[in-house]
């Protein structure tokens, strides 16, 4: 996956897809009552990026639905969206409520109440292991609303760079047994080693690991892109998706990697 980083403004959906992104990451901020309010990152953010682009969450999600509905020119290209849920503004006890409100919002504005809504896969990316009840609240709400089938399109990620063993235990608490993506990374302003990404890949490839896919962020330089592919990741999050496309076309990588499409299953671990 060539994942466009920090896509918080409706115009940027086109911009990143046109540069080659088949997935985007969008920041979601919450109000005091745990309602998803804006797609907004704020300062500080990645070097070389405008941190202040934003939309109302509902408006962004409706535009996303249009972009990922058959018949739209972007439909074939954009097949996965990571919602980077900025839950640090909430109290821990609000996590479940945030999950409920997010589910109701997406059900209405993205999935169109199950009636020919957006088709992209959705990843709920949560920065704090303590907020795992966001997942259970989200799942229960879709079940209560009679749309458990939409959970087939939803996956999970804890983005806090926690110990992989602790992440696995947290999923056990949440009752999650699949659809698990694992991120690792740091802002493009700083360098980060590959120790933890290697641990995540090892968990993915082991018989008893819970991880299905691994992605690394934020990768903007050509050499870092090569190093990341050499670590055998499934996704690269970047501010420059065209650089990822360029490197994937190099002889060393074009036989081993390709850009994923709707024919692929993002919850299935790739076996060589």
From Swiss-Prot:
Expressed by the venom gland. One of its GO terms (cellular component) is extracellular region. Its EC number is 4.6.1.-. InterPro entries: PLC-like_Pdiesterase_TIM-brl. Dermonecrotic toxins cleave the phosphodiester linkage between the phosphate and headgroup of certain phospholipids (sphingolipid and lysolipid substrates), forming an alcohol (often choline) and a cyclic phosphate. This toxin acts on sphingomyelin (SM). It may also act on ceramide phosphoethanolamine (CPE), lysophosphatidylcholine (LPC) and lysophosphatidylethanolamine (LPE), but not on lysophosphatidylserine (LPS), and lysophosphatidylglycerol (LPG). It acts by transphosphatidylation, releasing exclusively cyclic phosphate products as second products. Keywords: Cytolysis, Dermonecrotic toxin, Disulfide bond, Hemolysis, Lipid degradation, Lipid metabolism, Lyase, Magnesium, Metal-binding, Secreted, Toxin. It comes from Loxosceles variegata (Recluse spider). This is Dermonecrotic toxin LvSicTox-alphaIC1biv. Mg(2+) binds at residues 25, 27, 84. Binds 1 Mg(2+) ion per subunit. GO terms for molecular function: lyase activity; metal ion binding; phosphoric diester hydrolase activity; toxin activity. Disulfide bonds join 45-51, 47-189. The active site is at 5, 41 (nucleophile). GO terms for biological process: killing of cells of another organism; lipid catabolic process. It is found in: Secreted. The keyword Transcription does not apply. Its cofactor is Mg(2+). The lineage of its organism: Eukaryota, Metazoa, Ecdysozoa, Arthropoda, Chelicerata.
């Amino acid at each position: 996956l060539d994942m466009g980083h920090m896509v918080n403004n409706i115009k940027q959906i086109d911009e990143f897809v046109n540069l080659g992104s088949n997935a985007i990451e969008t920041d979601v901020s919450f109000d005091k009552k745990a309602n998803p309010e804006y797609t907004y990152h704020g300062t500080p953010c990645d070097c070389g990026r405008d941190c202040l682009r934003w939309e109302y969450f509902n408006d962004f999600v409706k535009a996303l639905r249009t972009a990922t509905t058959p018949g739209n020119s972007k439909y074939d290209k954009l097949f996965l969206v990571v919602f980077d849920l900025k839950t640090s503004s909430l109290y821990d006890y609000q996590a479940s409520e945030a999950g409920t409100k997010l589910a109701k919002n997406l059900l209405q504005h993205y999935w169109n109440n199950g009636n020919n809504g957006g088709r992209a896969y959705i990843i709920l990316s949560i920065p704090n292991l303590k907020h795992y009840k966001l997942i259970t609240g989200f799942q229960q709400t879709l079940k209560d609303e009679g749309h458990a089938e939409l959970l087939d399109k939803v996956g999970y990620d804890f983005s806090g760079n926690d110990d992989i063993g602790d992440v696995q235990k947290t999923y056990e608490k949440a009752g999650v047994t699949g659809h698990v993506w694992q991120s690792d990374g740091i802002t493009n302003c700083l360098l980060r080693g590959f120790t933890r990404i290697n641990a995540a890949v090892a968990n993915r490839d082991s018989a008893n690991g819970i991880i299905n896919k691994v992605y690394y962020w934020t990768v903007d330089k050509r050499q870092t892109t090569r190093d990341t592919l050499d670590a055998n990741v499934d996704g690269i999050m970047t501010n420059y998706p065209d650089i990822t496309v360029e490197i994937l076309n190099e002889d060393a990588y074009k036989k081993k990697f390709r850009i994923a499409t709707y024919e692929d299953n993002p919850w299935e671990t790739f076996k060589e």
